[in-house]
């Protein structure tokens, strides 16, 4: 059964909409009763009735109901949220709607949700109970009784929801309604779409809108959004002006204004223009309202334009009557643009003097121009012209009204005063409208510039599309007829000096440019090669490559050439006169059609002119303004960015192609030859013991180059990596040979160093039993990383790369060389026939490459210092499980550092030779820093401070090596030999450092060729002519005669750390250390030769001295300079007790 709607003119009416049987039930019942019935039902309703005069409305809202829920067996006015606050909001909106109704409206409604009997599912329908309509003769008490009886006939479910005197629904009622809404939401939706009355829908819409967050009130927000959302044609008209644009509707909508007095009319007309922000609509309203206030027949409004030095008036609207439609007025003003300079005519004089002009008889005034009357046939009698100023008193326009319509022949003082007062408010409105128009234009400009910025990235591979898009946007925004872009030949700009000489063989070979030819020379360098031209709105862009003759004959091209040469922006109002004033422009074509030109250079990031942008002729025939120039400058900047970005992109593509070619060539030459690979494949590989691979004392000094490769293969075999990961044997051999080939022949960081690092890792894994903590894949990655960790090393460190700003330092900002080593490793693996990981699964490949990368980067000592504290913390906490990803990475990093510096733990005869290689490489880098950077290198790289190397070796061991090996051997005791070897070498370096500090032991060679032990440790061997110098020990004492011994050489006595060969004095600290060294040397049977020599010289000197000798005073402690040889040593062996001589020596020291 379809719902029926019954309406009556009585004071009480009800609306009944019933649901069909078995169909969707109606969740809302709206009962419209009389005002007295609504008042009585308030006690039984869930909300208080709202009153508005004679109308009273009761709204019952079931809390907890949402608009999308299914209806339940209850009573609700409108589905709402569970809080009473929403009900209050709804009542507030309803009160507002009642207040907005006209007086005398007698519509009151009571909204309830009820279920008819017999519907167990809780569905409800909109119905009108019998007897609810009351006649006008019924008393309020009778109507109240009938209303109460109607409520009492509801079902028990309805009574649970509507209870008096409760103002809110119970939670049980809410649950029942919510349950029904959740079970049957489609029933509620169907009722809303098919059977809900318009009044219920409107109230529901108000309730939904009320729940939305309110926007901040703004006078211009809605208009601005509507303006920007409209099309460009609609933007030219105000949205609110369209309804008032017809000539017939304007008098109708203003007819009620005639009933207002003058004050009310004035205020009403002010309100009419107060919030109007469309400049066209505002000017139209001003003229119509002024005509209404002053009884003027028609009026015109002029707006001030131009620069401060060249101002003029432009007719915004002209000859507007009260019946003139806005569209007609705007069209006529646009078609016949009237421009009046300041000081010309009536309006021009008012604008210049800011004084009002009231003319009673226009034809008798010399300033009046009667040409308009002759064209239109209209006769002008009286004119009232008045300036429009802003709040600062500046002229922003002029308003002019003509002829009275009330029978008067002139404008009296009353008209003048009303006109002046109204224009005061109009000045504020006009300036606001202009500011709003400027904001809209600025918004559009910003949107265009954002689109241009987006286009730069989208069209970076297509220069023609990018320039065409920029030109199109510039033409549309600046309203010009044509637009052109000239691009400079950049290859010509970057031509070498030799090419210029070849082009001009008759010119002298000099870089100097004659002043007379400077402009022509610049023109040659800024030669245009590409021209983009864009004509009218429906014309496509034209791209051409003009010839030299075409550029020379074109005036526009010559002007563009002038801009490119000078780098200046030109804004030309009269092209013919400008060309006449510039003699450099020698064009042949006609320029009659060209009126105005705006030409601007396009520059790249280096401020080089790469093109010229040119605008030709404004659409309205006026010159380009400063505002146009500023906007066009933004287009030129974006055009320059786009062109520069496109060229950079092209260059990057070329460089990438070159890089690919270079990598192919490098890969070919970096790969081992097939002959070498076949030879190594067929060679027999000795056992690991024959190479001493399991020992931490391994040395490669006795191995030839081929043996080093065989030793590497043996390590892979012993770790079972070849069969485990199915590495083809020929691929492994080729990879080993390729790795060896890619190491440079530097003194230390070469292939031999990589072999030693890999062997130490192998010994740690096998002998040190570290393999139990590693997987086979990690062992493979660690060995590969050890062999590749210094690939392509240049003999310089990261600091040198940064100082010299090398390409590697630019490519890698941190761990420069280590990243390069890893990249070289990847390059070799990617070379044909060198991928030893080819049989791995993708997951295993990623895992092993991650291990290799992390291990190689860990060889940077900066990374070691970052990881060391975390590793020490784990060890101190007793960590024994190293299988976590982070912990395994820390352990591998420490192992890589331990292997990288393992030369410090080799036997002393190996260690000091390796130290010589390291020192040589460091000294070479120091020499490069002095030569290339003109800086003083650090001590360990300064060849002049090579005597400090033993001391620096001790510091290196103390800071890096010993702490690392100590913590490793404490955790993994099987690698203790590394710690013990380092400790032994530290003692040797410390002993050498002390002797060097005393000056007793240093061989004057460029490198550490022979340690002092080689000539001082063998007491049994015969000493052959070793020159030894003993200087004065008590050097500060003078003889009694005030002069030094004649045998004492002259020397500088201030230094205490100079060698004895160079000086004749020892400081107190040096004598103390020397005494300590001598005592330490007395270990029993075989004192060192140096000690024997010193004792021999001292005993001979003491035996030769006599206490009474006149030539040697007793007070003098001087000792002569003597040369020690083998014969002297043997001949000087007098029968002197050895302990006695030692005691005398110690006494002297």
UniProtKB/Swiss-Prot annotation:
Cofactor note (record): Binds 2 divalent metal cations per subunit. Site 1 may preferentially bind zinc ions, while site 2 has a preference for magnesium and/or manganese ions.
Swiss-Prot/TrEMBL keywords: Cell membrane, cGMP, Hydrolase, Lipoprotein, Membrane, Metal-binding, Methylation, Prenylation, Repeat
Modified residues (Cysteine methyl ester): 1146
Domain PDEase: 673-996
A GO term, aspect molecular function: metal ion binding
Name of the protein in its database record: cGMP-specific 3',5'-cyclic phosphodiesterase
Comp. bias regions, Low complexity: 1-19, 31-47, 60-85, 132-158, 1115-1135
Span list, region Disordered: 1-175, 1037-1066, 1096-1149
UniProt domain GAF: residue ranges: 278-430, 462-643
SUPFAM superfamilies: GAF domain-like, HD-domain/PDEase-like
Subunit structure: Interacts with PrBP.
Active-site residues annotated for this sequence: 749
Bias-annotated ranges (Polar residues): 48-59, 96-108
Any GO CC annotation of this UniProt entry: plasma membrane
Documented EC number(s): 3.1.4.35
Keyword Membrane: yes
Residues annotated to bind a divalent metal cation 2: 790
EC main group: hydrolase
PANTHER family: CYCLIC NUCLEOTIDE PHOSPHODIESTERASE
Lipid-binding residues (covalent, S-farnesyl cysteine): 1146
């Amino acid at each position: 059964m379809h719902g029926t709607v019954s309406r009556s003119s009585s004071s009480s009416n009800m609306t009944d909409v019933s649901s069909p049987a078995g169909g969707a039930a109606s969740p809302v019942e709206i009962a419209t009763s009389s005002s007295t019935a609504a008042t009585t039902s308030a006690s039984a309703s869930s909300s208080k009735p709202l009153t508005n005069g004679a109308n009273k409305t009761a709204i019952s809202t079931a809390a907890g109901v949402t608009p999308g829920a299914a209806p339940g067996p209850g009573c609700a006015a409108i589905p709402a949220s569970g809080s009473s606050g929403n009900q209050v909001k709804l009542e507030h909106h309803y009160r507002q709607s009642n207040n907005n109704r006209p007086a005398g409206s007698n519509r009151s409604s009571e909204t309830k949700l009820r279920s008819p009997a017999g519907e167990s599912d809780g569905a409800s329908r909109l119905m009108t109970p019998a007897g609810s309509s009351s006649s006008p003769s019924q008393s309020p008490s009778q109507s109240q009784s009938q209303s109460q009886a109607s409520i009492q006939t509801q079902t028990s479910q309805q009574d649970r929801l509507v209870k008096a005197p409760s103002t809110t629904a119970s939670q049980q009622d809410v649950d029942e309604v919510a349950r029904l809404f959740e079970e049957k939401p489609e029933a509620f939706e169907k009722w809303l779409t098919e059977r809900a009355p318009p009044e219920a829908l409107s109230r529901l819409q108000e309730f939904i809108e009320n729940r939305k967050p309110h926007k901040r009130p703004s006078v211009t927000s809605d208009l601005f959004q509507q303006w920007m959302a409209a099309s460009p044609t609609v933007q030219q008209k105000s949205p609110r002006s369209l309804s008032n644009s017809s000539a017939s509707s304007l008098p109708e909508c203003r007819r009620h204004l005639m009933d207002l007095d003058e004050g009310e009319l004035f205020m009403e007309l002010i309100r009419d223009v107060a919030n109007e922000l469309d400049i066209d609509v505002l000017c139209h309203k001003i003229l119509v309202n002024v005509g209404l206030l002053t009884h003027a027949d028609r009026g015109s409004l002029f707006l001030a334009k131009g620069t401060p030095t060249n101002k003029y008036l432009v007719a915004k609207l002209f000859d507007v009557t009260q019946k003139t439609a806005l569209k007609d007025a705007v069209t006529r003003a646009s078609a016949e643009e009237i421009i009046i300079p300041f000081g010309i005519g009536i309006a021009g004089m008012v604008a210049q003097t800011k004084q009002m002009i009231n003319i009673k008889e226009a034809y008798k005034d010399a300033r009046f121009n009667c040409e308009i009357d002759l064209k239109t046939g209209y006769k002008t009698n009286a004119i009232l012209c008045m300036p429009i100023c802003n709040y600062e008193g500046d002229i922003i326009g002029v308003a002019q009204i003509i002829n009275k319509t009330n029978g008067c022949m002139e404008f009296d003082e009353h008209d003048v005063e009303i006109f002046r007062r109204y224009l005061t408010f109009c000045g504020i409105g006009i300036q606001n409208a202009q500011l709003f128009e400027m904001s809209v234009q600025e918004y559009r400009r910003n949107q265009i510039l954002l689109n241009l910025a987006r286009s730069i990235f989208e069209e970076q591979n297509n220069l023609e599309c990018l320039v065409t898009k920029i030109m199109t946007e510039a033409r549309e925004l600046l309203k010009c007829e044509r637009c052109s872009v000239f691009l400079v030949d950049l290859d010509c700009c970057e031509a070498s000096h030799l090419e210029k000489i070849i082009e001009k063989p008759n010119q002298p070979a000099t870089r100097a440019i004659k002043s007379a030819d400077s402009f022509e020379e610049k023109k040659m360098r800024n030669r245009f090669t590409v021209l983009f031209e864009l004509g009218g709105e429906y014309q496509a862009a034209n791209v051409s490559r003009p010839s030299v003759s075409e550029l020379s004959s074109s005036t526009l091209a010559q002007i563009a050439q002038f801009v490119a040469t000078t780098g200046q922006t030109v804004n030309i109002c009269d092209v013919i006169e400008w060309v006449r004033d510039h003699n450099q422009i020698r064009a042949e074509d006609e320029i009659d059609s060209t009126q105005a030109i705006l030409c601007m250079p396009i520059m790249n990031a280096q401020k080089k002119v790469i093109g010229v942008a040119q605008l030709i002729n404004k659409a309205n025939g006026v010159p380009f303004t400063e505002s146009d120039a500023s906007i066009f400058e933004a287009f030129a900047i974006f055009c320059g960015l786009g062109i520069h970005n496109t060229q950079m992109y092209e260059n990057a593509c070329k460089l990438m192609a070159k890089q690919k070619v270079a990598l192919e060539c490098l890969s070919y030459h970096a790969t081992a030859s097939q002959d070498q690979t076949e030879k190594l494949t067929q060679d027999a590989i000795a056992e690991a013991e024959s190479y001493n691979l399991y020992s931490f004392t391994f040395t490669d000094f006795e191995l030839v180059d081929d043996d080093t490769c065989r030793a590497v293969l043996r390590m892979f075999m012993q770790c079972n990596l070849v069969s485990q990961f199915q590495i083809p044997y020929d691929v492994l051999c080729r990879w080993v040979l390729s790795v060896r080939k890619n190491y440079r022949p530097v003194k230390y960081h070469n292939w031999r160093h990589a072999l030693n690092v890999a062997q130490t890792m192998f010994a740690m894994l096998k002998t040190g039993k570290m393999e139990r903590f590693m997987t086979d894949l990690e062992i493979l990655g660690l060995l590969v990383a050890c062999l590749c960790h210094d690939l392509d090393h240049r003999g310089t460190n990261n600091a040198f790369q940064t100082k010299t700003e090398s390409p590697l330092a630019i490519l890698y900002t941190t761990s420069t060389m280590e990243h390069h080593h890893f990249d070289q490793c990847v390059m070799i693996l990617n070379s044909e026939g060198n991928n030893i990981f080819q049989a791995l699964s993708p997951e295993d490949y990623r895992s092993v490459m991650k291990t290799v990368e992390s291990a190689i980067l860990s060889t940077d000592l900066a990374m070691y210092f970052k990881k060391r504290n975390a590793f020490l913390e784990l060890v101190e906490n007793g960590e024994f499980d190293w299988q976590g990803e982070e912990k395994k990475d820390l352990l591998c990093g420490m192992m890589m550092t331990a292997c990288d510096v393992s030369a410090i733990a080799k036997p002393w005869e190996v260690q000091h030779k390796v130290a010589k290689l390291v020192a040589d490489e460091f000294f070479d880098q120091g020499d490069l820093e002095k030569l290339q950077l003109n800086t003083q290198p650090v001590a360990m790289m300064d060849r002049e401070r090579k005597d400090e190397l033993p001391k620096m070796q001790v510091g290196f061991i103390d800071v890096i090596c010993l702490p690392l090996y100590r913590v490793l051997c404490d955790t993994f005791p099987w690698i203790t030999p590394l710690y013990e070897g380092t400790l032994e070498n530290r003692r040797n370096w410390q002993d050498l450092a002390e002797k060097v500090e005393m000056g007793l032991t240093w061989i004057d060679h460029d490198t550490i060729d022979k340690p002092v032990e080689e000539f001082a440790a063998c007491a049994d061997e015969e000493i052959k002519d070793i020159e030894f110098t003993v200087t004065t020990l008590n050097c500060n004492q003078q003889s009694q005669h005030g002069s030094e011994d004649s045998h004492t050489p002259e020397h500088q006595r201030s230094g205490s750390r100079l060698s004895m060969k160079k000086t004749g004095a020892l400081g107190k600290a040096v004598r103390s250390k020397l005494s300590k060294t001598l005592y330490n040397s007395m270990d029993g049977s075989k004192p060192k030769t140096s000690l024997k020599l010193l004792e021999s010289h001292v005993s001979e000197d003491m035996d030769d001295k006599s206490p009474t000798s006149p030539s040697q005073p007793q007070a003098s402690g001087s000792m002569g300079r003597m040369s020690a040889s083998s014969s002297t040593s043997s001949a000087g062996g007098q029968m002197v007790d050895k302990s006695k001589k030692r005691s005398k020596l110690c006494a002297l020291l």
